[in-house]
Regions:
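Mobile, glycine-rich extracellular loop/lid and propeptide segments
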Residues: 1-169
Length: 169
């Protein structure tokens, strides 16, 4: 998963296994240049988040988004325990491609598809809540939700789908 920041000229590629975000200076690259993502400017999201939120154990980085004005970047992070709540890490984008951690927000289980609203006032994640062992008897089926972060008021709301439970087959 890759996002480009036209304001700074940097692209960011998710490496969920290592917990690092590869920062690629596209603005300064020439057409003859190639990028080895293994040698990119890595930002260790896993270490940054685990140091800032000691209650969270990193499992996977699933998605990245950049605000339309190019000033902020956010990533969605699943917990090591697939049935535990995930996190959003929100960063300020610096001109040199580096990121400064602003805040960490708790999400529902297995957040993915992170996005800013067009006006940049909110962050949204689809919290998948999928069972890892299938739907067999005794398996854990975490609740799916949508997390809404209001950045102005610094509040988190998790919208669930329990109102539709009566419509299940």
């Amino acid at each position: 998963i890759v996002e480009y920041n036209p304001k700074t000229g940097w692209a960011y590629a998710v490496n969920g296994q290592t917990g690092k975000l590869a920062a690629i200076p596209l603005k300064t690259m020439e057409s003859k240049d190639t990028v080895d993502l293994l040698d990119a400017n890595d930002i260790d999201i896993k270490s940054l988040v685990e140091a800032a939120d000691t209650s969270f154990q990193y499992g996977d980085m699933t998605s990245v988004t950049i605000s339309e004005d190019g000033t902020r970047l956010a990533v969605s992070l699943q917990a090591e325990n697939y049935a535990a709540d995930g996190r959003i890490a929100l960063f300020t984008c610096n001109a040199d491609g580096t990121l400064s951690l602003e805040k960490i927000y708790e999400t529902g289980v297995q957040p993915d598809m992170i996005t800013f609203t067009p006006d940049g006032s909110k962050l949204l994640t689809a919290d998948e809540g999928e069972p890892r062992e299938g739907y067999s008897k005794g398996s854990t089926d975490p609740q799916g939700t949508v997390t809404i972060v209001d950045l102005a008021s610094d509040t988190v709301t998790k919208a669930d789908f329990t109102a539709y439970d009566s419509e299940a087959n």
